[in-house]
Amino acid sequence: MTGNGNFVSDPIIAALLSEVSAKLAEIVESGTSFRIDLRRLPLPVGGTAALRDFLGNGQVEASFRGVGSCIFSETAVAGVWWGQQYNTGGDLVGEFIEIAYVPELLKCETDEIEQAMKDLGLKVREAQQIRGRGSESSSSTNRSPPSSVSNKT
């Protein structure tokens, strides 16, 4: 973790970090993820920036686009993600800490994966049919074998 830890003496910040630590222990035991909405907390002036600096930067950043967008940044603390939510105009409308192996919004739902399996299967079959039609027309012409194929007579 980086940053100046002086702000940790603030009781709200200290309680928040204690909560994050407790939720990390819970996720190891239960696998349940948690989200803390930073905009609903009475953080001191500069507290959000100081907290983000204190938690540091990890190696992963991911975005989700829907109505507006959401950016998740892994912190230097494994399992602790910094989330920022934007409206369609690009204004920051939410900021939160998510304690999770992977942020919930980034996970595929079972029904999405089931539909993706069907869609991919259909796409593969269509591609094979197109390829098969192309092979039939090219097989009627007399072509020499590729140079890597040897003819033994």
Model feature map: region roles:
Residues 1-3, 144-153:
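Eukaryotic low-complexity, non-globular regulatory regions
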Residues 73-141, 151-152:
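Helix-rich interaction surfaces within compact, conserved domain-sized segments
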Residues 1-50:
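N-terminal domain-onset segments
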Residues 37-41, 60-89:
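Short, structured protein-protein interaction patches enriched in aromatics and acidic/basic residues
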Residues 8, 142-143:
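Compositionally biased, intrinsically disordered/low-complexity regions enriched for serine, proline
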